[in-house]
């Protein structure tokens, strides 16, 4: 899935930024991911905007969280450098937000900074640049509760 690929890339990039360094296989993976998102000859607008990576069209539901923001948004484009959200609240240029994308038993958390904003009817279309290292939370089901002494004492009371 696209979200997992972006998560892998941002994690490896974050590892570099922390000064930990990468193993040879991780360096190869970063190179592979960067080449897969390299602009094509048809992506003329990228050179004008200064974007380094191509964004892929997608249809994901996410939650945007920030200062007085906790809204459901639609992620319509995503790439290693950033993403575009539709049905978004107002996000000023430079404002930091968190994008939470749920995928079955995983919850991806990306930090992003507002870059541009366009009026989209009642809501906005927002361009965000990804920053920092993302987090992936694994959801696990706890086993069924087994009655014990505490439960027996509570029932007797």
Predicted segments with their positions:
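N-terminal helix initiation/capping motif
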Residues: 1-78, 133-157
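Short structured motifs
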Residues: 46, 95-99, 111-113
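Short strand-loop-strand
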Residues: 57-98, 125-129
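Short beta-strand-centered aromatic/proline hotspots
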Residues: 73-74, 109-116
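Short, conserved beta-turn/loop elements at beta-strand boundaries and strand-helix junctions
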Residues: 80, 117-122
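Short, charged beta-turn/beta-strand-edge "cap" motif at the junction between a beta-strand
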Residues: 102-107
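C-terminal structural segments of small proteins and small subunits
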Residues: 120-140
